[in-house]
């Protein structure tokens, strides 16, 4: 996590929690010539446009007061979407029983990408039940070896 995202997270967290929401993630990325500060929020039942506007206005005011970012940027507050990232222990716990996609830093059992049902999480390891052709296989992945993890939408 970069220093900017850490500072923004410390500013955004009290605002989001005061509104009984969860701060899912903060990203500060350059796309073409422009910088984007993306803040992802959620709550049980999901967030709507009014929630995003409310947090955007409060956060924008605080960011203007503290001015932690030197360059010009666009502030974007939104839901994490259907393919929500899994970063915190609570994200993994909530995802047990759901379809997930994970990518590891190095190959595990000959692969770096895994998609399937997250069947277990113990704080250090996740177990994903993947399907290889017609066989099901359980793969254990140490959390510290996971480069990217998110929910995965499936169309049946």
Curated annotation (Swiss-Prot):
<keyword id="KW-0690">Ribosome biogenesis</keyword>
<keyword id="KW-0963">Cytoplasm</keyword>
<comment type="similarity">
    <text>Belongs to the RimP family.</text>
</comment>
<dbReference type="InterPro" id="IPR035956">
    <property type="entry name" value="RimP_N_sf"/>
</dbReference>
<dbReference type="InterPro" id="IPR036847">
    <property type="entry name" value="RimP_C_sf"/>
</dbReference>
<dbReference type="InterPro" id="IPR003728">
    <property type="entry name" value="Ribosome_maturation_RimP"/>
</dbReference>
<dbReference type="InterPro" id="IPR028998">
    <property type="entry name" value="RimP_C"/>
</dbReference>
<dbReference type="GO" id="GO:0006412">
    <property type="term" value="P:translation"/>
</dbReference>
<dbReference type="GO" id="GO:0000028">
    <property type="term" value="P:ribosomal small subunit assembly"/>
</dbReference>
<protein>
    <recommendedName>
        <fullName>Ribosome maturation factor RimP</fullName>
    </recommendedName>
</protein>
<dbReference type="InterPro" id="IPR028989">
    <property type="entry name" value="RimP_N"/>
</dbReference>
<dbReference type="Pfam" id="PF17384">
    <property type="entry name" value="DUF150_C"/>
</dbReference>
<comment type="function">
    <text>Required for maturation of 30S ribosomal subunits.</text>
</comment>
<dbReference type="GO" id="GO:0005829">
    <property type="term" value="C:cytosol"/>
</dbReference>
<dbReference type="Pfam" id="PF02576">
    <property type="entry name" value="RimP_N"/>
</dbReference>
């Amino acid at each position: 996590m970069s220093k900017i995202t850490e500072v923004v997270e410390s500013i955004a967290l009290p605002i989001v929690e005061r509104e009984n929401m969860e701060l899912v993630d903060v990203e500060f990325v350059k796309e073409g010539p422009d910088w984007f500060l993306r803040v992802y929020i959620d709550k049980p039942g999901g967030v709507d446009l009014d929630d995003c506007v409310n947090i955007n206005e409060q956060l924008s005011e605080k960011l203007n007061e503290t001015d932690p970012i030197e360059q010009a940027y666009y502030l974007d507050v939104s839901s994490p979407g259907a393919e929500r990232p899994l970063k915190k222990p609570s994200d993994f716990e909530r995802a047990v029983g759901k379809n997930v996609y994970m990518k590891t830093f190095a190959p595990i059992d000959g692969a770096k990408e895994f998609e399937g049902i997250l069947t277990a999480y113990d704080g250090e390891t996740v177990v994903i039940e993947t399907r290889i052709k017609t066989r099901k296989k359980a793969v254990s992945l140490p959390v510290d070896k996971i480069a990217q993890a998110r929910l995965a939408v499936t169309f049946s």
